[in-house]
Every structure is written in C-alpha cells, then in structure tokens.
Design a protein with these regions (language model features):
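Long, low-complexity, intrinsically disordered polar/charged segments
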Residues: 1, 17, 55-69
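Helical mechanochemical/support elements of P-loop NTPase systems and associated helical scaffolds
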Residues: 3, 15-18, 22, 50, ...
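Conserved nucleic-acid-binding Ia/Ib motif block in the N-terminal RecA-like helicase ATPase lobe
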Residues: 4, 8-9, 63-94
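Hydrophobic transmembrane signal anchors and adjacent membrane-proximal interface regions, especially
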Residues: 12-13, 36-37, 51, 70, ...
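The conserved Walker
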Residues: 40-44
C-alpha cells in the first residue's frame, strides 16, 4: 500500500474528512525543510500536522528507531502516543 493511500486511511481512522489549511501547509513545509515552528491555538490540529509528515518520512525497511519526539510533559507525550495509535499505522510507538 502506498503512503498516499495509507494517509487517506489515517484520516478515516481519525474520523477526519480533510486536513485544515494549517495542517496542509505544515505538512508541505515539514517535508521540505529541516526547521519548522508551528504556532496555532489548542485543538487546531498541530499534533496531526506534524505526525503525518513523520509517517511519510518513515522507511519500513529500517527496523531501528527512526524518530524521537521530545515534549515538555508526560501528559502531552501520552496524548501524542494516543493520536499515533489511532492513526493505525504499522509502526510501533512507545
């Protein structure tokens, strides 16, 4: 299954019909730039805005750690983990 098709399934798994403008722009910028800062209100979709491009960059043939997400609190880390699991990817998160 290609990444584009899987991305559509991710949105379905999350009950989302389409990305909002911030998420679309963020995805393009994250995939094409090394340094990104997202400033957007709580509940605007920042987590998905950065998780989707991470998913796009992961390589299934690499079995070691490919991504490390640093967050300022355990609670935020747990929230991000929950979103990733709801996305329904084949990649492990912990």
């Amino acid at each position: 299954m290609n990444k584009k098709h899987h991305s559509n399934n991710i949105l379905l798994n999350l009950g989302i019909e389409s990305l909002n403008e911030m998420q679309e722009v963020a995805q393009d910028v994250i995939l094409n730039d090394n340094n990104v800062l997202l400033l957007s209100p709580t509940g605007s979709g920042k987590t998905l805005a950065f998780l989707l491009p991470i998913f796009e960059m992961l390589q299934p043939e690499i079995l070691s750690v490919q991504c490390l997400i640093l967050v300022p609190s355990r609670e935020l880390g747990l929230q991000i983990e929950q979103v990733w699991k709801k996305m329904g990817t084949d990649y492990k998160v912990n």
